[in-house]
Amino acid sequence: MEFILSLIGSLLLIICVLVSVAFLTLLERKVLGYIQIRKGPNKVGLMGIPQPFCDAIKLFTKEQTYPLLSNYLSYYISPIFSLFLSLFVWMCMPFFVKLYSFNLGGLFFLCCTSLGVYTVMIAGWSSNSNYALLGGLRAVAQTISYEVSLALIGFKILLFSFL
């Protein structure tokens, strides 16, 4: 019974994260619209509120294309794996109701975020394009350099919280 409740809680958390990301992109589009002295997305529904759902439907119904010389399986699996990793990181966040409580949550967070580097590298490599590979390697180098500073800041916060 406890497993089913934690599974339902995890699915509810993932759905809430996806919906909040959709509405944050709507907020971003609205703010950018007002910066450019226009209203932003307002054609769908009341004040454009159903716009993220319409965008999701449009993205899921678009024709799937892939480069002719690409490695088909890794070309499609790497972005999906990246999405699952970014959603999996939310499981260790402490909320009012702890879904998964364990002592090494910070280390789990750093491990999951560092696995995202491999998805970018595989996505760049699997397209069999030199430009995509170079872009992927640049993104990997940038992500690794950001992870080092994130880990140092996190460890400093942990160190000073015990003093």
Curated annotation (Swiss-Prot):
UniProt GO molecular function? NADH dehydrogenase (ubiquinone) activity
Q: What is its main location?
A: mitochondrion
Q: Which domain of life is it from?
A: Eukaryota
**Location of this chain's protein in the cell:** Mitochondrion inner membrane
The enzyme's main class, written as a single word, is translocase
Reaction it catalyzes: a ubiquinone + NADH + 5 H(+)(in) = a ubiquinol + NAD(+) + 4 H(+)(out)
* Pfam families in alphabetical order: NADHdh
Against InterPro entries, the record matches this protein to:
NADH_UbQ_OxRdtase_su1/FPO, NADH_UbQ_OxRdtase_su1_CS
Q: What is its EC number?
A: 7.1.1.2
Any one annotated GO CC term: mitochondrial inner membrane
Q: How does it sit in the membrane?
A: Multi-pass membrane protein
* Keywords from the UniProt entry: Electron transport, Membrane, Mitochondrion, Mitochondrion inner membrane, NAD, Respiratory chain, Translocase, Transmembrane, Transmembrane helix, Transport, Ubiquinone
Into which family does the record put it? Belongs to the complex I subunit 1 family.
Name it.
NADH-ubiquinone oxidoreductase chain 1
Q: Which organism is it from?
A: Drosophila pseudoobscura bogotana (Fruit fly)
Taxonomic path: Eukaryota, Metazoa, Ecdysozoa, Arthropoda, Hexapoda
Q: Which gene encodes it?
A: mt:ND1
